[in-house]
Amino acid sequence: MSSPSQTAEDPVIELDGVWKIFGDRADEAMRAVQNEGLGKPEVLEKFACVVGIADCSFTVPRGEIFCVMGLSGSGKSTMVRHLNRLIEPTAGRISVLGRDMLSLSGEELRTMRAVHLGMVFQHMALLPHRTVRDNVGFPLQVRGEPKSKRWEVSQHCLELVNLDGYEDRFPRELSGGMQQRVGLARALASDPEVLLMDEPFSALDPLIRRQLQDQFMALSADLNKTTVFITHDLDEAIRIGNRIAIMKDGRIVQIGTPEDIVTKPADDYVRDFVEGISKLKLVFAHSIMIPLDQYQASQKIDLSAATRAPHGTDLDQLIDITTTTDHPIVITDDDGGDIGVIDKTTLLKGIQGGKA
């Protein structure tokens, strides 16, 4: 199979109306859902089938870290396994790198997984009888690459995750965090465009988890990987994700930036999820500022000497600036032009969660 052809503007991943119903009567249940609008409890009662995911749709652009989160049983792990067809959907369309995943032959699907898709699980399933070097190079061995090539790539990937010097160790000689890094290096070895990560750091201690999050974010940016990252930890999703999808009972209930999710929850379920999350690092000046024309029309204040701050300045930084001046803060665009104003009243409303 030749490499999928895409432009930089095309979505790397597209899901459109994807359903998964588990059970012997899944097709019959699917027809009933479509024709009668049955819900998850009715499907279980009438057909003895379980709705895993329900009408999931989203797109992921190139280079984005798209986090999917929800409680246990919400369908997030089931959903991510549809992207490489470890699980077959009952209905819907799945496109990855411009290829219709459901139309691929067995050989094409194996090539797609081996070359273009990398997956990292919570439990790495490293081969215990192989060294770290050979574990990392295993995907290349499956592709038939010679040992010299495998070792060269393994060395490079181990350096990326700061494990150079551990090439000849065995998994049992490594800590849990180090084993996770071996798993990430293994996923990177085939240089896939897409990474599918299913709670890869959730079993680790908080300090190690944070270190691996930092390392992963840096690698993702440097290598321009497109990632679907599954987690049950909202703090992790907010820290890592460019956008977040929240799932409940197999459905996606909201998709948005971390700021959107925290400040504009779609329903009570999302609101309960984000309760207690600090907004100080998630809400930015452009979201709460008063537009410059509107401010000048109502306030006769000379802003020429006011402190300037970029539109991407977060609440925490705005608070620091406010403590150093009695004047409003003028917000600027990417070119340095004045576009808005934040006074102390506006800042307090932003901290409380309101808009100017």
PLM feature spans:
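Conserved ABC ATPase "signature" region
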Residues: 32-42, 99-100, 141, 148-165
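Conserved ABC transporter NBD signature motif
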Residues: 92-100
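Conserved ABC ATPase signature
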Residues: 170-174, 178
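A short, proline-enriched helix->beta-strand linker immediately N-terminal to the Walker B motif
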Residues: 189-193
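ABC ATPase "signature
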Residues: 255-256, 264, 341
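The conserved cystathionine-beta-synthase
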Residues: 297-335, 340-356
